Amino acid sequence: MRLDDFSTHDFALVETILSDPRMMDDFGGVFPPEKIEKVQRHYLASTESEEGWVFTIRPSEGAEAAGLAFLWDRPWRDDVITELVCQVVPEYQRRGLAAEAARSVIARARLERRCKSVHAFPPESSPAAAALCAALGFAKLDRCDVDFAGARLRARHWCLTL
């Protein structure tokens, strides 16, 4: 597995993810083109400014993109936390890519002392995401509603102390 910095070459991957009903069912449905463009620009700006980390997940060197991994700060209740997100397209799911990408991003965050803890908010309806959080050593916290690009998501809050 390889993580590459997100670039304009990955815009098609964002469109693939955000327009796939299987991937977006829990997130308010597929995004219209203008919203996809806004997300693409946000991911690129986060990468270029280093405010957040956005990586393209590839199964191997030179392979087509299989998904995205993010680590960025977000407001949460009365605080700012660091959130980890991994999205792998259906054709590449169940191959361990999300787990491997998450481990790599967490290891880098730990090495660079980017944060003291990492949070994840997988949809309650995703037992695979919950199993991944548990396998990575995250502690299960509370159920909550989170905002995902303007859509309300019923999620489970997980946290990993680095």
Residue locations for each model-derived region?
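An amphipathic alpha-helix signature
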Residues: T8-E15, P33-R41
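A short helix-loop-beta-strand connector motif used in the catalytic cores of GNAT acetyltransferases and
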Residues: Y43-T56
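Juxtamembrane/interface motifs at transmembrane-helix termini
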Residues: P33-E37, A45-T47, V88
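Residue-level marker of structural boundaries
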Residues: M23, P32-P33, A45, F138
